[in-house]
From Swiss-Prot:
Pathway: Cofactor biosynthesis; coenzyme F420 biosynthesis. It catalyses: phosphoenolpyruvate + GTP + H(+) = enolpyruvoyl-2-diphospho-5'-guanosine + diphosphate. Belongs to the CofC family. This is Phosphoenolpyruvate guanylyltransferase. It comes from Conexibacter woesei (strain DSM 14684 / CCUG 47730 / CIP 108061 / JCM 11494 / NBRC 100937 / ID131577). HAMAP family: CofC. GO terms for biological process: F420-0 metabolic process. Guanylyltransferase that catalyzes the activation of phosphoenolpyruvate (PEP) as enolpyruvoyl-2-diphospho-5'-guanosine, via the condensation of PEP with GTP. It is involved in the biosynthesis of coenzyme F420, a hydride carrier cofactor. It comes from the Bacteria.
C-alpha cells in the first residue's frame, strides 16, 4: 500500500481574509505560513505517508514544500480546492499511489500518531473512503481515498454529508472518523480562539503556530 498525502495551499498573500477584523494582513500571512509548516512537519513524521504532494501557486509555499521533502505542484489556475485535489490525485496515481489522504494546510494541530492510527487501521473492504469531519461535523478536513480516484471530491459547505453520499453512490465502503487533531481548521475568529485554547491546553504540537501566536500576543495584546 502506497499512501500519498495531498495538500492544497492557497497563496499566502491575502490569506485568511475572514480574520481581517482582528488581524492585519501581515499577521494573517504569518499565521497561514506557520500553520502550513506545522502540517508539513506532522506529515513528515507520519510513518504511513510515503510522499506528500503540495498543490499551490505560491512560490514561497513551493520552496517550503521542497524543504520538507514534499513535491510541489504548481496550481496556476487556482480553480479551487476540488480541482487542486483532483490534479493531485492524478499525479499521485502516476507516481504509483494506491490511496491518497487529502488534508488542509490550516490544521496545525495534526498529530502524526493520529494519522498513523487512521492509516494503519485494518479494513475489510478493498475500496473505501474515510471522511474526517471538521469540528462542527459539517465540513471535510480529511479524506482518505482507496483507490485514489474512487470518487471525485466535493469540498464546500456541508461537504461531509455530500462526500458520504458520493462515496455510497460510487460503491465505496464509508467510514466517518472523528479525529480532534484534524478537526480544527482556522478560518474564522471563533476558529482562532478555539486554536488558542487547544494550544494552551497541550504542551506539544503546532510549534510554529504556537510561536507565531505568542509573538503576536507580545506585540499586540489585543490580538
Amino acid at each position: 500500500m502506497s499512501t500519498f498525502a495531498i495538500l492544497p495551499v492557497k497563496r499566502f498573500e491575502g490569506a485568511k481574509g475572514r480574520l481581517a477584523g482582528g488581524l492585519a494582513a501581515g499577521p494573517r500571512r504569518a499565521l497561514a505560513e506557520a500553520m502550513y509548516v506545522d502540517v508539513l512537519t506532522a506529515l513528515r513524521r507520519t510513518q504511513g505517508v510515503d510522499r506528500v504532494l503540495v498543490l499551490t501557486a505560491d512560490p514561497g509555499a513551493q520552496r517550503v514544500a521542497e524543504g520538507y521533502d514534499a513535491i510541489p505542484l504548481d496550481d496556476p489556475a487556482e480553480a479551487g480546492q476540488n480541482r487542486a485535489v483532483m490534479r493531485g490525485v492524478a499525479h499521485a496515481r502516476e507516481l504509483g499511489a494506491t490511496r491518497v489522504l487529502c488534508l488542509s494546510g490550516d490544521t496545525p494541530m495534526l498529530d502524526p500518531a493520529d494519522l498513523d492510527a487512521l492509516l494503519g487501521r485494518p479494513r475489510t473492504a478493498d475500496r473505501y473512503v474515510v471522511i474526517v469531519p471538521d469540528r462542527h461535523g459539517e465540513g471535510t478536513n480529511g479524506l482518505l481515498l482507496c483507490p485514489p480516484d474512487g470518487m471525485k471530491p466535493s469540498y464546500g459547505v456541508d461537504s461531509c454529508a455530500r462526500h458520504k453520499a458520493l462515496a455510497e453512490e460510487a460503491g465505496l465502503a464509508v467510514e466517518i472518523a472523528e479525529i480532534p487533531s484534524v478537526a480544527l481548521d482556522v478560518d474564522t475568529p471563533d476558529d482562532l480562539d478555539a486554536l488558542r485554547e487547544l494550544i494552551a491546553s497541550r504542551r506539544g504540537g503546532a510549534a510554529h503556530t504556537r510561536g507565531m501566536l505568542n509573538q503576536l500576543l507580545r506585540t499586540n495584546p489585543k490580538n
